A protein has these predicted regions:
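Gram-negative outer-membrane beta-barrel transporters
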Residues: 2-85, 118, 127
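Short, glycine/charged-rich beta-strand-loop motifs at protein surfaces that mediate ligand recognition
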Residues: 89-96, 103, 107
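Short coil/turn motifs at beta-sheet boundaries
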Residues: 7, 56-58, 97-99, 114, ...
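Flexible, surface-exposed loop regions and adjacent strand-edge segments
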Residues: 1, 44-52, 82, 91-96, ...
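C-terminal beta-signal and adjacent terminal beta-strands/loops
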Residues: 80-87, 106-152
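Hydrophobic, lipid-facing positions within transmembrane beta-strands of outer-membrane proteins
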Residues: 10-14, 59-63, 100-106, 142-148
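Generic hydrophobic alpha-helical membrane-segment signal
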Residues: 12, 18, 91-96, 113, ...
Length: 152
């Protein structure tokens, strides 16, 4: 990685959310979108002057939906990252493709005596998307996680 002396960013971000409760039911949503161009303005004599900063996508977005009922929670999230360059040279061969993941989580909270217990099962990367966040470092495919949390 490299530190850049001067970077200029120009973009637009939008966020929307909604929360609602009906008796024992709850709904929470959150959506984010960013369109942003980040460029290197460190040295006008440098051949990479005004090139896009590595790992800085033009487009990124997320959507989170959480449904709850009487101690249960079902949450899904969708994350998207657009094409981006791995190096400041901005060569096409150093382009990393866009990717998205969908995660799903089921959570239950309950009591055992005076203790609060939370059980969670998660499926991360539900669609088994093959992608690299950093060049040559592939991210895991579909994976599962079970968590049991006992608060004393």
């Amino acid at each position: 990685m490299v530190n850049f002396g001067l970077v200029k960013s120009l973009g637009l971000s939008a966020t929307a959310g909604y929360d609602r409760q009906w008796g024992k039911f709850s709904l929470s949503t959150n959506a984010n979108y960013t369109c942003q161009r980040d460029r290197d303005y460190s040295s006008p004599a440098d051949p990479e002057y005004k090139n896009t900063i590595p790992y800085s996508p033009l487009h990124s977005a997320s959507l989170i939906l959480d449904l709850g009922y009487d101690g249960y929670s079902l949450c899904t999230s969708w994350l998207y990252t657009g094409d981006r360059f791995a190096l400041i040279s901005n060569n096409r061969e150093d382009m990393l493709g866009d990717w998205y993941t969908i995660d799903l989580k089921l959570n239950k909270q309950f009591h055992i005596g005076k203790h609060n217990v939370q059980a969670t099962i998660e499926c991360n990367n539900l669609t088994d998307s093959r992608h690299e966040v950093v060049k040559r470092y592939p991210m895991p495919g579909r994976n599962w996680k079970f968590t049991l949390q006992w608060k004393i």
